[in-house]
Amino acid sequence: MDFTIENQDGRYTPSEEDIAEAERLIQKRIAYVNRYHENQGGDCPVVDEHMRKYERQYVGFTDITGCHIVWVNFVWDENAAERLKQDIVLTEGGCGHYWHIKVNLSTGKVYGLEVNGTGDVKYLPRVKKNPPRISRPKQPQPAGKIRRTGIPQNPQEAHF
């Protein structure tokens, strides 16, 4: 599983101001965005009632229109603190203990709330994409002049 958002153009590191603004917008709008309490209740916490108990991860993106979007990952697990420092934590199960949301800092929109389903928690490894493959010649080319065609030439061929 690779980690991207829709219409992603790139990534950026959110500043302290970006994080503070994302938190402010989430606090302001979480009750409305979470009005249906999907995968919450019973043994699962209702996320907007326990906001202070979650550890957070912030990942910044830019979309194709140039908007700055912060993806905020909420984790309520005292054993996940070390994982949170190393990489993006993605899980299955755990209901309201694990959820994430997106904040568009350019428009102030809070959207994309996803609360994990019920069941045992399973940490998902993040599959990293291989870098692009660069073709290289099998045999190193001897130093020489380059013809206008781009083909290396031997020094003996320098005179026509």
Report the location of each language-model feature.
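N-terminal export/targeting and maturation segments
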Residues: 1-30
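Structured segments of extracytoplasmic/periplasmic soluble domains
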Residues: 25-36, 104
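Functional cores of ribonucleases/endoribonucleases
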Residues: 35-98
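C-terminal partner/receptor-binding element of secreted or periplasmic proteins
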Residues: 95-131
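Cationic, low-complexity basic patches in intrinsically disordered or flexible, solvent-exposed regions
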Residues: 139-142
